[in-house]
């Protein structure tokens, strides 16, 4: 046998071994619903976007029912800047007036959503782009936040404008799609309970969708490895009580707090497990779901 043939055989054997090791994980997720919140740096990199799309298609063709929820903060910011509209934030959320919500809806439900649909279809899948307004899937109520004035130390209620939080989720549309070789891709734009449109934080939106569907897993793709301890080391597993303790002692702080709170919310709504993970790693979704140890922080009840 020549060296080149031997190398080809060895490579084929390695690929077969990888598939064999992935088999029990595929069986575990067979016919299960997995909600993936897609955002962060990975969305702005075409190569990582293609890897993500391949992961989602492979999951669907392996018997999993994936649901993709995407963000788009940087893209919204870029469009607002292009139009000469200044972005303002409070408590980590974009203040959204009437002019801004129209642009947010256009960017999220139009441009970004269709780009992701295109990548998935290019990878061999059959993706359908939707938003929370379709079929009244997600109805939202007005979100409010309180901030503490640094000088007076008095709490103030901030009006975020057309920013909402999920109030009800109707899964009828998704129930008709899942299990039919179709992959729903959802933009976090929702109908207001009192009429109109609300922009919803993508993590919060994904948590509400996962809870309503009774998902086996909710994956939150971020720009960090997961939840880190005080030495900046990854914590591989946490419970709800441990998460609350880490928030209370300041280990979990800043932008990680709302992500962990979303995890707790989803778990209390019935999701089996939630993972905060690094979406910048190529094929991060497969590495998390189809390997023995995963790559992020798994949070369970």
Swiss-Prot record:
It holds the Pfam family AA_kinase. SUPFAM superfamilies: Carbamate kinase-like. Its EC number is 2.7.2.8. One of its GO terms (molecular function) is ATP binding. It catalyses: N-acetyl-L-glutamate + ATP = N-acetyl-L-glutamyl 5-phosphate + ADP. Substrate binds at residues 72-73, 94, 199. This is Acetylglutamate kinase. It comes from Azorhizobium caulinodans (strain ATCC 43989 / DSM 5975 / JCM 20966 / LMG 6465 / NBRC 14845 / NCIMB 13405 / ORS 571). The gene is argB.
